Amino acid sequence: MPPHARSGRGPKPQKNGRTEQRQQKRKRDQEDLQQLQQRVDELDLKSDATKKFSELPLSVPTAEGLEIAHFQTLTDVQARAVPLALKGKDILGAAKTGSGKTLAFLIPVLEKLYRAQWTEFDGLGALIISPTRELAAQIFEVLRKVGTKHSFSAGLVIGGKSLKEEAERLDRMNILVCTPGRMLQHFDQTAGFDANNLQILVLDEADRIMDMGFQSAVDALIEHLPRERQTLMFSATQSKKVSDLARLSLKDPEYVSVHEAAVSATPTNLQQHYIVTPLTEKLDTLYGFIKANLKSKIIVFLSSGKQVRFVYESFRHLQPGIPLLHLHGRQKQGARMEITSRFTAAKQTCLFATDVVARGIDFPAVDWVIQADCPEDVDTYIHRVGRTARYESNGRAVLFLDPSEEPGMLKKLELKKIPIQKVNVKEKKKKSIKDQLQSMCFQNPDLKYLGQKAFISYSRSIHLQRDKDVFKFNKLDLDGFAASLGLPGTPQVKFRKGEDIKKIKNAPRQGMSSGSESDEDGEKKTKKKEVRTKYDKMFERTNQDVLSSHYNKLVLDGDDNDDDEEDFLSVKRVLRDDDLDDEAGAYKSTAKIIDGLGGEEPFVVDSKRREKALKSKKKMLKFKGNSTKMVFDDDGNAHAVYELRDEDDFMGEGPAEEQRRKFVEDETSRVREADVDDKALAKQKRREKREKRKAAERAELMGIVSDGEDAPVLHNADDGEDPLALLRSLPMGDGSDSEGDREPPKKRAKKWFEDDSDEENKSKSKSKGKVIRVQEEPETLEDLEALATGLLD
């Protein structure tokens, strides 16, 4: 039997066989890559015969991923953009909403890294930037489906998640889908992370990323990327600005516009209408429209998040008969993702949203897109209505316009080849909800607060719009709009000059105050510090509700003096907060005021608690101020520890060189005097040490045992003491322990016939025979008297 059969091991030639198999597999992979590259090089860009993904020169993992995700037929933008991207060209892609732009850049990303044999050790190879978190999450999900057969590592980097967890995994990622702000934060803060090996950069919704709102973040982001890279830019409204292209370092980009020659810039199967409704009737029209379409899937776009919150809360109380959702940028990321998934899965629901979901988000089967607020430009309109009629499906869109906005907006839409028709609202469909909103605002202060916030945000958004041909702030009925929201009065809105709406819209959330909405021109004047008694505090006391200060800022009551006729009960005087302060200040306080404690404010004794505090040093410390350290000169004058003199006083004492010489002489003499004392002290210590050593040696010769620490020391005869007095006082024993160290004798045990009284009698008898030991023989009369006194006692 051969030896390898006993041990169970195979022959060595099998190991060589496995090595040969690996080499052959590596060789086949190299040949497949060469063939794939050859097919890409031979690809004819002018041919329009490519209709399916199987006809493109794609790798096996990509083809299998497309088949698993059920992608078979190419859209127009994919048929034109993918071949150019496979050849390494920079692309500017423009196509209608819902035309498949996401897949048009994901396939080139996977193929670029696959042909380069990219691994996790090569670092970041592809970067995909999206303007919103929801769109980035959607792109990442499509990437997971299409790239399921690839071995690349991909990550989603958006705000609202743990920065530390992202940083730990970032250096192992090959493909990143991100938002600009979060990615820039990682480039600036994450140690060891760079993009020096980046192969391809993708900008989805590029016109939104390149506008003024993201300009600073994108410019800083581009500085971290290498210049030698492939760049792909896609959007439904593409930018051709030379400055934008130069910022991204594009090299001879190919402009792909599939629907440039189309009759309309929006999908052909999209029905577009607009309704002219005054601002005061906007909510009534919106509520009636929702009530008439309860079996539909609806998206309602509003201009601000505060409007979204107010409309959602008020309609939720009205219960129109359809599930309601709301989505805006102020929500936490988890809530935003949950609402997005719920709306995607629902068949009959209404979503109130801002422009957070206006771009790129693919909501299936949306029936209606309602723009309750006029969009800021035509591009925003195109992206909003693009949430319906996705890829050859039908959809309908409605735009609400104020009579002042109608002429300018229609002219803008006509220039962009957008067909839109006017429709009128049926009278029987109209239903006023003004009284219901007013009742709800009266009963619910929080809803009233949201209404005031919504009014302010809408007024600011209209005032800050650049296109004054469409948005005419002075022609809006703001008083009627406030009444239609259910508010008792028109909130006061103040504006600042030179504001940029896009910069404000895209500003970091940390820079915005969530608790205050005031934009006052100047800071409030600080009142002069005065002595405030408990009566002053009583006059200044106001409502402690959380919204009370907000109401005082917004609502002005009593300013309207238009009515000349007096009512039966007329207001003769309106007390303001300032008037209350004056009344409180005019009150003559009888409180006792104590000055001179050292603090900045005097101490006011206006209660028994204050009088009691006078007796406590701890409580009075805060009224005494901070202590100061003073130094007294030879004349007894107090000076601070560190004093600064001006130049005139310094020069009055003589030239600087003479003062320096005098200072050196004084310090030298002071040091010499101190040196004499130091030498004498050192000499005395040496003498004491020497005498201590001699005394220890002498005691050792005499047989005295010492611990070494308290050795006897012989003093000088000059001290007036007997040098041998210390030696006489020492115990002269036989080397045993001293009496103090001996244990006291044990007490004798009691006999059976003894008790405590016997012990007391015995102690009394002992005390009668007291013996007084005399240390020395009395020599003087005083010694004899002291001895006699002791015997008498």
From Swiss-Prot:
Residues 282-431 form the Helicase C-terminal domain. The keyword Nucleotide-binding applies. SUPFAM superfamilies: P-loop containing nucleoside triphosphate hydrolases. Residues 82-256 form the Helicase ATP-binding domain. Residues 17-31, 657-681, 739-754 have a biased composition (Basic and acidic residues). The Q motif is unique to and characteristic of the DEAD box family of RNA helicases and controls ATP binding and hydrolysis. This is ATP-dependent RNA helicase DBP4.
